[in-house]
UniProtKB/Swiss-Prot annotation:
Its EC number is 1.10.3.9. InterPro entries: D1/D2, Photo_II_D1/D2_sf, Photo_RC_L/M, Photo_RC_L/M_CS, PSII_PsbD/D2. The lineage of its organism: Bacteria, Bacillati, Cyanobacteriota, Cyanophyceae, Synechococcales. It comes from Synechococcus sp. (strain ATCC 27144 / PCC 6301 / SAUG 1402/1) (Anacystis nidulans). GO terms for cellular component: photosystem II; plasma membrane-derived thylakoid membrane. This is Photosystem II D2 protein 2. Belongs to the reaction center PufL/M/PsbA/D family. GO terms for biological process: photosynthetic electron transport in photosystem II.
Amino acid sequence: MTIAVGRAPAERGWFDVLDDWLKRDRYVFVGWSGLLLFPCAYLALGGWLTGTSFVTSWYTHGIASSYLEGGNFLTVAVSTPADAFGHSLMLLWGPEAQGNFVRWCQLGGLWNFVALHGAFGLIGFMLRQFEIARLVGVRPYNAIAFSGPIAVFVSVFLMYPLGQSSWFFAPSFGVAAIFRFLLFLQGFHNWTLNPFHMMGVAGILGGALLCAIHGATVENTLFEDSEQSNTFRAFEPTQAEETYSMVTANRFWSQIFGIAFSNKRWLHFFMLFVPVTGLWMSSIGIVGLALNLRAYDFVSQELRAAEDPEFETFYTKNILLNEGIRAWMAPQDQPHEKFVFPEEVLPRGNAL
């Protein structure tokens, strides 16, 4: 007599069916992260294209900011709401627009729409990298690296204005608008002298340098494994052997610097660590600016420059430049304040 012992098949619920459908092998992977990524990315991009095409900033900044008004790709923007609205979410059905779409656009509601959907879209993209890494069976360092751009976006577009009086002081979504924001950060926060900005610059430029050095070194040490003039055709994605000589690369840089990477894993981790850490440091610095924290103030140089007309340093010159940015930028940047500065209070260099 034969006795078959088995387990009854577990019932598949709606969650299992949905999980199978989301993770099905298709040209563009969806996944659970796609439920957040695709709608948010679509709405953020659509809101930006709509705003830059048709929506004016006359009611919020007193400027033209759309293609419809004569702007071009470098000058159009989705502008921040007016200063008077504070940190309102600017919902379409909220007390500001009261369900009127045209009024909502005029008051700057599209900026909140693009900023919030953009932030969640970026988070969805990072979760997508986590999800695919788990399914493929690789480590999640791509997702961890992408936390750097997310930190910068959230700190600049959300944390900074939350620390200030309103969304008005966040950057608008446009090329020239971002440049204006950079000048604003310099004039009102002396951002370039901030150590976190310095670490950010070192990280980004250092990452670019490492990338250039690594790419050039690999190209220099490719194995001569083809008779063709084009070395790229000699590579096969599934080949088992190395395509370049790490030993030769190590000898080359050892002769130049006296020191070189001998471990590929450490080398590539360093290429990940430098730029991502720079982005994180910049984000921390922006949060500090949101709280109006000061960085370096060399008061002794300022006092001596005030007492001695012949004493001047690059620091004191930059302080004067910052005063100039504030004095001349504020009336243009914040027309609602109706600033009027008489000529005698505008900054002048010691030599004038």
